[in-house]
Amino acid sequence: MILIIYRALFFVTIPGVNSAALAKLSNNSSLTMLSMFSGGGFENFSIMSLGVTAYITAQIIVQLLQADVIPTFTQWSKEGQTGRKKLDQVTRSLTLVLGLVQATGITLGINTLTNGKFMIENNPFTIIVIAVSMTAGSFIAMWLGDLITENGLGNGISVIITAGILVRFPSMINDVIKGVTFGTKVNWIRFSELMIGAAILILLIVWFTRSELRIPIQYARRAQLTGKDSYLPLKIIVPGVIPVIFASTIMTIPQTILMFFNAGQNSSWYRVVQTFFTLSTTSGVIIYGLMIIFFEYLYSIVQIEPDKFADNLEKQEAYIPNVYPGDPTKEFIQNMLNYLSLPGSLFLMLVSIIPLLVANSVSSSLQIGLSGSSILIITGVLIEIGRQIKGLKLKREYGTFLSTDFSLDD
């Protein structure tokens, strides 16, 4: 129901814009990237055009600042639910600022690219109306994402991004068909090869996403009572698809900033930024891949938190065999995360950048190039939803079992 509401809002267009002028920028790489996170909101310039990009950017900044950059944020991160609420409030406030800046930059940039034909009336009031409308839509998307997280299945923001990608999938398939069409005939053999390749890719993603390293955990009291041990399952890709989502978001920021300076397109700094922060160039794709690796390592630590894990084990009188409690346990978990992050990050990077490199050499469609990242996000999110459904099912069955009345009477 929440996704239906989210999708319905795409038909609420922003007043004061010329849709015909916008349609001429359909192949713009920056808008294509942004559309991946909003489900095509830029096609009719709806209030949902920004999607959740501003919120994701704010999350990245706040989480990075927690790493002993701002002591107050670091302290809040250790205060449990109370501290989390404070950090969430900071994230929302930062989302407001980033949303307004991003919306203003996109509006001015599109207006420049269309030679002033994008806005029906070129005045500050129109810019303010458009920017506020886009920012309001971003907050609505953020709120709906939080509702999904609290009451639905999976991470709400990831689910919203996945829904947006799925909406654009028919268009992506159409681009693929155009790419294998010669004259008026479709090369179905080539098309079949691409579909088989996509199927193999999905299988690899499923295997990597579900693979895990099990670290044995022993509880002194439990071992005496039951003789059974527990284990900590560490996935090969610990943070899931978050590195791909965050790297994709970061790549849109420089392009948005450049929209403020379209008049300086001939300057050297403009060309450098445009070259290194766009997915239509080899250098930009390489930077995108390096960002995926960086976020894989970073969010493996953020998600597991070796410090807290070691402290919790000690409080529960549990330990990892052959590893001393305290700092040695922390270092052991840290080493395991680094060990797993190497194959995990390389896999995420290769799946994301190979289609981009191929598309840049044989096709002008960035949508095809983003197919690897899109399939990765969709598959990862659906696997996580499936895992949660399985957990809820087991919980319900367990509850039914406990509520059943048993009698020892004949």
Swiss-Prot record:
Q: Name one Pfam family in it.
A: SecY
Q: Which compartments does it reside in?
A: Cell membrane
What would be one Gene Ontology cellular-component term for the protein? plasma membrane
Q: Which controlled-vocabulary keywords does the entry list?
A: Cell membrane, Membrane, Plasmid, Protein transport, Translocation, Transmembrane, Transmembrane helix, Transport
Q: Does the keyword Cytoplasm feature in the UniProt annotation?
A: no
Membrane topology according to the record: Multi-pass membrane protein
**Domain of life of the organism in this record?**
Bacteria
The record's listing under InterPro entries reads: SecY (IPR026593), SecY/SEC61-alpha (IPR002208), SecY_CS (IPR030659), SecY_dom_sf (IPR023201)
Family membership noted in the UniProt record: Belongs to the SecY/SEC61-alpha family.
> Tell me, how does this one assemble?
Component of the Sec protein translocase complex. Heterotrimer consisting of SecY, SecE and SecG subunits. The heterotrimers can form oligomers, although 1 heterotrimer is thought to be able to translocate proteins. Interacts with the ribosome. Interacts with SecDF, and other proteins may be involved. Interacts with SecA.
Q: What does this protein do?
A: The central subunit of the protein translocation channel SecYEG. Consists of two halves formed by TMs 1-5 and 6-10. These two domains form a lateral gate at the front which open onto the bilayer between TMs 2 and 7, and are clamped together by SecE at the back. The channel is closed by both a pore ring composed of hydrophobic SecY resides and a short helix (helix 2A) on the extracellular side of the membrane which forms a plug. The plug probably moves laterally to allow the channel to open. The ring and the pore may move independently.
The protein depicted here goes by the name: Protein translocase subunit SecY 2
Give the lineage. Bacteria, Bacillati, Bacillota, Bacilli, Lactobacillales
